[in-house]
Amino acid sequence: MENKIVASTKEEFNTWYKQFAEKHKLNNKYTESASFCAEIPQLDTYKYKMELASTDNERDAIYSSALIEATRFCAPIMECAWASCTGTVKRGLEWFDKNKDSDTVKVWDANYQKLRTETPPAEALLAYQKAALNWRKDVGFSIGEYTSILKKAVAAEYKVPGTVINNIKEMLSDMIRRRNRIINGGSDDAPKRGPVGREHLDWCREFASGKFLNAFNPPWGEINKAGKSGYPLLATGLAKLVELEGKDVMDKAKASIAQLEGWVKENKDQVDQDKAEDLLKGVRESYKTALALAKLSNAFRAQGAQIDTVFSSYYWPWKAGVTPVTFPSVSQFLFELGKNPKGQKKMQKALINTPLKWGKRLIELFADNDFTENRIYMHPCVLTSGRMSELGISFGAVPVTSPDDAAQGSGHTKAVLNYKTKTEVGNPCACIISSLFEIQKAGYDIESMDIVASEHLLHQSLVGKRSPFQNAYLIKGNATNINII
C-alpha cells in the first residue's frame, strides 16, 4: 500500500486536486467546499426505526447508520486530501517527534494515562491549544479559508428554515441548561448566575486593564459583595469577560491585583491595614473563583470547538507508532469504517484484528471505560471510540491508496460542518443537525446524556466553523447567546 496523493508543496497539491476535481465533477451546490454531494439526504426513516428499537445496541446501530447516511458524500474533498497527502503526513508526524519534549506537548502527552481517567488541569488544556496552533504554523497546514485559524467573534444571528426552527431552539435551550448545570455545581436547582450588566462588565474591564484603584469604589458598593448566585460580583464579571474577550483577561486582572497589592504596601500609612487586607484577600479569592467559573463555562462552550480535529488526528496515530509508510493502511481502515456503521465493540474488534501494530496501540489509547467524570471535561488529546470520527474525517474520506474510491462515499460525523448554512439553499447544515437530534430524541433520554452529539455539532456551527479542519480556539463570544431566527 502506498500513498497516491503525492504532493510536498501547496503548488504540487493544487495540481493534483485540480485534475481530481475535474475528473469527478466535484460541486459545491450544498457544501462550502466542493464535495460529491448531489442532494440533501433524508433521514426520516431512521427516526421511525429508532422509535421501534428496544435495545441500546439497536439504537446505537441506527444512529451510526443515520450519521453515515447524513455525511457519506458531503466531506470537503480538497481539505481531506490535503490532510492526507504525502507532504502533510511527513511533516505532521515528524512535528511530534521534534516537539514531544516541548512545554506545550509534554504537559499532556506525558500524562496521557492520567488524562484517560481524570479531569484535565487548566494548564494541560492551554498547552494543547498552543501546541495545536504551533503545529498548524510549523506544518504549513493552512491553504485557504477551510483550513484556517478562526479569530472572528460569534455571529449575533443564525438563520434557519421555519421547518426546523423549533428543534434548533430546543437544542440551544438544552445547551444552556447543561452550561448552567456545570457552572452551578452539577445541580439544576442551584442558584444560577444571572446576566452580567453592562456597568458591572465595564467596571471589571477597567479594573483588569490596570485601573486597580477602582477596587476601592465599585458600582455595587463593597468590592467583596456577592450576587444572588453566591459568587462575588467581581468574580462573575471577570468570568463573563473571559467568555466575551478571551483568556488574556485573567492575565491582565492578575497584573492589576499585583499593582493594587504594591500600592497598598507603598501607602501603608494612608490606609486602614485591617480593611486593606480584607479587601486584598477578597480580591484574590474573587480572582480564583473567576478562574474556576471561566474554566467551567469554557468546558461547555468549547466542548468541541476546542478539539482541533486534524491536530488530534495526527497525534493519535503518532502515539500509536504510525509512520508515513504505514499511514495508507490507517486511511484505508477509516475509509471502510465510514462505509459500514460499527458500534463501539465492533470497531474495537476490527482494530484488534488488524495485523498491523497500530491497531492494538490505538485501542490502548481508548478511554471509553476509564473516564468516570462528565465527558464534557475530557481532554481533547484523549482518544475514544466516538472520537474515531475525528480520525475518519481527517484521513478516511479520501483513501490515499485509491483516491478515486472517495466517489463511493464514506461518512464521518464532522463532515456535517461542510454543509452550507446559507438560507438561500435552506441551511442544510442546520436541517441535517435537526434531523439527527430528532433521531436521538426518539431513542435516548437526552437530559441524562453527558454530551449530545447533535448538539455538539450545532455548537460548532454556531461558533462559525464551516469546516472540520478549522481551528476555533481564538473565536470570541458565546454560542449560546446567539439569536436563532
UniProtKB/Swiss-Prot annotation:
The record marks 216, 263, 270-271, 275, 279, 355 as: Homooligomerization. InterPro entries: Nairo_nucleocap. Keywords: Capsid protein, Helical capsid protein, Hydrolase, Ribonucleoprotein, RNA-binding, Viral nucleoprotein, Virion. GO terms for molecular function: hydrolase activity; RNA binding. Changing residue 272 to E: Complete loss of cleavage by host CASP3/caspase 3. No effect on virus repliication in mammlian or tick cells. Pfam families: Nairo_nucleo. It is an enzyme of class 3 (hydrolase). Its EC number is 3.1.-.-. The record marks 272-273 as: Cleavage by host CASP3/caspase 3. It comes from the Viruses. A motif (DQVD) lies at residues 269-272. Its cofactor is Mn(2+). Endonuclease activity is stimulated by divalent cations such as Mn2+, Co2+, and Mg2+. The DQVD motif is a CASP3/caspase 3 cleavage site essential for viral replication in host cell. However, the importance for viral replication is apprently not linked to caspase cleavage. This motif is involved in homooligomerization. Binds dsRNA and ssRNA and probably participates in the packaging of viral genome. In the dsRNA binding mode, the nucleocapsid protein specifically binds to the vRNA panhandle secondary structure formed at the termini of viral genome. Does not discriminate between viral and nonviral RNAs through ssRNA binding mode. Displays dsDNA endonuclease activity that is sequence non-specific. Probable homooligomer; forms a double superhelical polymer. Monomer. This is Nucleoprotein.
